[in-house]
Amino acid sequence: MHNVPGRGPHNAAHADSQERLARSPSMIRVFGHYISRIFIGLGAIEFCVLWLSLLAGYYIRLEARLEQFVAPFQTVSALAFGYAGITVLAMIAVGLYQRGLPWGAGFVLRILMAFGMSFTATVLLFYTIPHVTLGRGVVGLTFLFSLVGVLSVRSLFLRFAGSDVFHHRVLVLGVGRNAASVRDLEGPDQLFRVVGFVNVGEPGDVIPAPRQVRLESSLVDLMVARDADELVVAVDDRRKRLPVDDILDCKMSGMQVMDLVSFFEKEASLVNLDVLQPSWLIFSPGFQRRPLVDAGKRALDLVGASVMLAVGLPVMTAVAFGVWIESRGRGPILFHQTRVGLGGRPFRLHKFRSMRADAEADGVARWATVGDPRVTRFGRFIRKTRLDELPQLFNVLRGEMSLVGPRPERPEFVADLSSRLRFYSERHRVKPGLTGWAQLNYQYGSSVDDAKKKLEYDLYYVKNTSLFLDLVILLETVEIVLWGKGAR
């Protein structure tokens, strides 16, 4: 164990260091789910810009000409509040609050789509309020102010996005394979920067020498010298190489100390299987079934599935007709398949048929692949837009599935993956879903490596299940449908 020189009460320098290190956390945890404080701040600023845009558009247009018809400020302010909230939600839905979104035509298109969605909802909202006029002039001015305001805010945000203001500084304890996993996670889209990898005498170091730092005094002094916000413990062999006294000194000095699995959970929103130990699953908060949350999820499933079926009935009819036309009336419109659900129990899943009727005539289960020849032309469209999944709303109503959860797999795949991947069966602790956290964050899987990566996201969801996370996933699924991400 590494000995720390001069342990005991901190001197004045250490007291000053505590003030320097007392910075806001990079992530805020809401019902277990990590959200970047940067995007929370960005959303709050844009909310204010949108709120002011409608107020300005309304009063500039109507105050001088129709003073007798101008509604009280409180009423218009409340409606502007609703407009701003709807627009921010629409911006989340089209992916405008995600890391690494490039500036360009696609960015502007997303903003225009978000504004189109929000203006439609806001106009309907305005017409439910008596004595409030919302003409084309108000809509035009509000749109202009909103567009200029949001683009200006985003321009400033992107200008400073690469600065240290938006990143927290991480010191990694270790230079082996575990430390290398942090190095591999680094990238321009991440909200952290590694300021050094501390060499504590591990054999078989993987980190290049220029990035290594020696522990010459204490970890507290090194954290201060490197202006680090967080210490990540990533030593390969904790039993022999872990400087417990140093780490405890950092913790007791008010510095943030995090184990490697929790660091990945916070920064990548997944549970890293390569460094996961069973003890973390046991002692880490989460992985709890709460009756109130389960009841809330079931209520959301029933209401959401019923509304989606009612609204989507014309679409489902059109899809069914499209499948029938392409197959020239031969072959079934619906496709039924056994999948594994809650507790490992099998159930019968329904989909619109997107492949040839003889896709698995030999009886061998296969993953879909890129450009799979078994997929029909119309089937490719409904797979890309996820319209083939709509019949699963009936599975949701029957309680076999939820709107949100890990995607259900076939028994053949489950048996194989359970023998290859640790903790694979844990994804069956919750109901399978129509959409899920893995679907938002990873492409369609067609290999064991893909299944492993998706399992890491599924375990994050199982650990942090909440109504809030379900609503976030449902909202962000809109982008997946609009842009056809991950379909094969």
Regions of interest found by a model, annotated:
Residues L292-D358, N395, V472-R488:
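A hydrophobic, helix-centered structural microdomain
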Residues A368-K431, I473-V481:
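A short, structured surface patch at a secondary-structure boundary
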Residues I111-F115, F166-D184, G331-M355:
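Membrane-cytosol interface motif
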Residues A22-S24, R29, P102, R211, ...:
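Glycine-rich flexible loop motifs, especially short His-Gly-Gly/GGXG/HXGH segments used as catalytic or interaction
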Residues H2-V165, K297, R488:
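Signature of alpha-helical transmembrane segments in polytopic membrane proteins
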Residues T376, S419-R488:
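C-terminal terminal-structure detector
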Residues H2, V153, F157-L270:
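A solvent-exposed beta-alpha-beta segment
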Residues V200-D205, F264-E265, L270-D274, I333-R374, ...:
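Short, glycine-rich, amphipathic interfacial segments at transmembrane boundaries or analogous
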